[in-house]
Amino acid sequence: MSGETTPTPTPTKNDPTTRAVGSPRAERVAHALARDVRLPDGAGTLALVTIDNGLDHTKPTTFGPTGIAELTATLTSVRDRVRAGEVQAVAVTGKPYYLAAGADLTQVAGVTSREEALALGRGGHAAYGLLHDMGVPTFAFVNGVALGGGFELALNCDYRTAAADVRALALPETGLGLVPGWGGAYLVPRLVGVQDALDVILTRPAANKPFTAQQAERIGLVDVVLDTADFLEESVRWAARVLRGEVVVPRRELDDEATWRAVTDAARARLDATIHGSRPAPYRALDLVAHARDRSREEAFAAEDEALADLILSDEMRASVYAFGLVSGGKRPVGAPDAALARPVTRVGIVGAGLMAAQIALLLAQRLGVPVVMRDLDDERVAKGLEAVRSGVERLTSTGRLSPAAASRLLGSVRGTTDLADLADCDLVIEAVTEVLSLKKRVFAEVEQVVSPDAVLATNTSALSVTQMAADLQHPERVVGLHFFNPVAAMPLVEVVQAERTSPEALATGFAVASRLRKTAVLVADRPGFVVNRLLVLLLGVIVDAVEKGTPVEVADRALRPLGLPMPPFELFDLVGPAVGLHVLTSLREDLGERFPRSPGLARLVEDGTTVVLPAAGKGLPKPVDPAIQATFDAAREAEPLGEPLDEAGVLDSVLTALTREIGHMLDEGVVATPQQIDLCMILGAGWGFHLGGITPYLDRTGCSERVLGRRLLPDGVANVPTA
């Protein structure tokens, strides 16, 4: 297998991953246009300022230096009219679908000096401060998406209305290596209380969960939710009622000092337990919130300016903006063939009815809106698969994401069978059986006998050769890999695998299906483990190898804390299952050589039937290691010594060295066209944080890439503060 020649994905001219993702582009200026609106019932004149970049809804309104300067000029002019007695209220709103999406990140990433960074924060504070100092009531009519500095624009107003269909209100800065820098870290805890503020500023950004208008109203971020159809008119009427005293919006008292301290101390402990100091932004944001109770507005905003300037000039922020650019550009997949070549998919077959098969079947039925048939060997397996689909539909219904009528239609579109002939009229058949090459080959051979010559065959294999799987078929060109990740509905990545003889039509169909499923598709060559599993399994292999050499399990498990990964290695092992982990590690060792360590201790655990390495801990307690697990590794080492134990730093260095070397091999083999695609896969398929930029920016900034490969993986300044 290691000697096979596979097609190498080729970057295209417009490939977003081959340019400096965080490099500045020309500012899309957010214009601030003021007009007068006559308030009803003689309440006076409202100056309505609309933020609009003059582009369609696919180009969100963001603020760069010119936009902030224009907003400052417009609000200054409005304030002059207020002082002249011409205006009794001021409101801000946005173009259709957007209030504003915050600061222009490409402009932020272009900042190279502390003076520029400080000016960015101070400029926003000065502009928004005009709303606070206007001298008449100010309103934000939140008609659409309001993120970061866009939402802070609203927070600096006295009152906020929101349209009922608004689904994205957030301060996502800490997820991008920044802090809310235009008032949010001070205003939110004083508006909604310190506990809810930390949800807004820390918890939801980490989970990428913005607020809907209704959720924001419940905690007091907005004051009223109004019907979308006539939102602007209703907002104006509501503002008039506020001015006449008919509507009084209550504001909560500040939390007492003891509560404030207890909540922020608990939040700091949670950060220590989860990200272990790996990311500065959440800690800086927490510091700002912790002092928001007792600082004056001026002191708090000056502290925001300092924190923002520090973070803008950090590698973590540059990596985060780079990662954001990768994910944003991921919907335009690199190397995908002409979409017009894709075959129509009106009916899908799934071979297998296990957990992954059922998840794939449900998602296909839901997103493609086509009939799906699951086939397995006996009625019992088919029944289990259908029950898994039913449970998934019930979860969607119970959370309000499906109406009862839609749920009934969805259930009716998925059926099970033991008869292979029921797949005959499927345009696409996906196999999702056990990871055994001979079994998958047999499945494809059987399916090919009943489907049409134009039907596309796809495999959900996570590591096996798609080329070998298709080798004995009459039409191997119809086979493509579609590697979904578990849980299928939640994980946004699909690795689309181009085998040696995959046709452009089959490949285009794979990309089209991934797009209709709202997944980000990355083209990968048919090499063992593809991208995500090749790197994750190597990481786990190196960790286990350290334990084989005498490193205690707890030490090895803690070693990767500086990376701030979504879960420690042995927790990931427990999620995958020791047996599956051993199987894939052994398979990759056979295909790729001794870079993938063997593990006698892990083999013994599997022989003993062990399914969990770290038993579940009590709430708030660290997960303990079962002494029997450590004893098994110790016994295996006594029988066959493999080396010397390592400390945490040694384990981390071993992991980073191995990952760097493997990425070098992957690029040489053409598994993907660019390092950026590896980063995109690790972000979306392994949940690695934006602060890492995936993986290659971290390897560059720690010097691993130059030490191991003799070169950087990315150009200097693409995902880091330029060193020159």
Question: Each predicted region: which residue ranges?
Answer:
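Short, active-site-adjacent cap segments at secondary-structure transitions
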Residues: 97-101, 147-148, 464-465
